[in-house]
Amino acid sequence: MTSEPEFQQAYDEIVSSVEDSKIFEKFPQYKKVLPIVSVPERIIQFRVTWENDNGEQEVAQGYRVQFNSAKGPYKGGLRFHPSVNLSILKFLGFEQIFKNALTGLDMGGGKGGLCVDLKGKSDNEIRRICYAFMRELSRHIGKDTDVPAGDIGVGGREIGYLFGAYRSYKNSWEGVLTGKGLNWGGSLIRPEATGFGLVYYTQAMIDYATNGKESFEGKRVTISGSGNVAQYAALKVIELGGIVVSLSDSKGCIISETGITSEQIHDIASAKIRFKSLEEIVDEYSTFSESKMKYVAGARPWTHVSNVDIALPCATQNEVSGDEAKALVASGVKFVAEGANMGSTPEAISVFETARSTATNAKDAVWFGPPKAANLGGVAVSGLEMAQNSQKVTWTAERVDQELKKIMINCFNDCIQAAQEYSTEKNTNTLPSLVKGANIASFVMVADAMLDQGDVF
């Protein structure tokens, strides 16, 4: 695995969590699972050719890594990006196995994509690319086999083209993709799911750490990002009585000591569709004219906020460094939960985990919610979309939201139980590690299914 650094990193994280626990001592048979679960059940590589707008033929490499189906049909996104390669897709597919297991829904893990740059390509050419990609992929997927979703480069438009291609090639309308349009099989609450789910998970953390005495009410929350996840997380925090003191984009961040309002977040959402930066939005929109809003160019919010209780990184990977983590701890942060995948660097996670493991009581601890658990709301609602498709029904927004909340709370409880049951930590006065809890809980779920079905013997 040395030539696959991304995959190796994901594998090592799971291994270190389960090895640094009592699990192999209690259940030696689980040791046999590691070498088996680390090898994909199937890797499909295929040629994708299409005609560009100049009438010339182009070719790219397509992939689908069908990693593990012990818990259900393979489930994971399709990525159309020039960085797509087998190591990255194996890393993402491997992570997906365990994230999907934590939802409690019947979903295995997989990932796929195409090594292509869609920038500058017309709608027509993108449609031809999607049809060419699905021409081969359609042989290997199905509602009970493999149900892909979107990812980087594959949004609602591309999902539409891919679904249309599948329907055309197979002469079958079935829930073979998630993230579909609402009037052709999609689910309500899908755009909100990751942000809402993140807040529900964080609420469960607060509830547990304070024995139900505290909630988001009055808490100061620093959020990074201003896309889908950040917007809906911020709106849910405000709904629950929290104060959102920051948002950011790739060019800088906005800080508001008195709190960003839901009206301002709606303005940011509508402006972001037109690709406006936060700097432009703060200058141009009347909702920001009288508010005490500070824009900091070229910065992330972590070192510019003070007296914060909760941090929710929702922008991109490695956006919280070790030094920024120390700044957050110094500013009083007690809860950190990741809306972005790998939002914190290993150094930052070490800072948070050290602040937790060395605390003399739960009140002084800093608690870190890992992305594997904290941001699984998106894939959870994808699973609920599959359930609705299988019944040929559409649930109300209230029902989907209720199911999402239940999934996030159950996931949190599973992480806590695994951390407590299998922990080797000496300090029992502090809070348990949710990083280890998420890794161990998800590993046990997948391992049990593989052992029961004879994948491991």
From Swiss-Prot:
Residues that, per the record, bind NAD(+): 175-204
Covalent crosslink: Glycyl lysine isopeptide (Lys-Gly) (interchain with G-Cter in ubiquitin): 326, 372, 436
Enzyme class: oxidoreductase
Catalytic activity, EC: 1.4.1.4
Any one GO biological process: glutamate biosynthetic process
Keywords: Isopeptide bond, NADP, Oxidoreductase, Ubl conjugation
Active site: 111
Catalytic activity: L-glutamate + NADP(+) + H2O = 2-oxoglutarate + NH4(+) + NADPH + H(+)
UniProt xrefs under InterPro entries: Aminoacid_DH-like_N_sf, Glu/Leu/Phe/Val/Trp_DH, Glu/Leu/Phe/Val/Trp_DH_C, Glu/Leu/Phe/Val/Trp_DH_dimer, Glu/Leu/Phe/Val_DH_AS, Glu_DH, Glu_Leu_Phe_Val_DH, NAD(P)-bd_dom_sf
Protein name per Swiss-Prot or TrEMBL: NADP-specific glutamate dehydrogenase 2
Species this chain originates from: Saccharomyces cerevisiae (strain ATCC 204508 / S288c) (Baker's yeast)
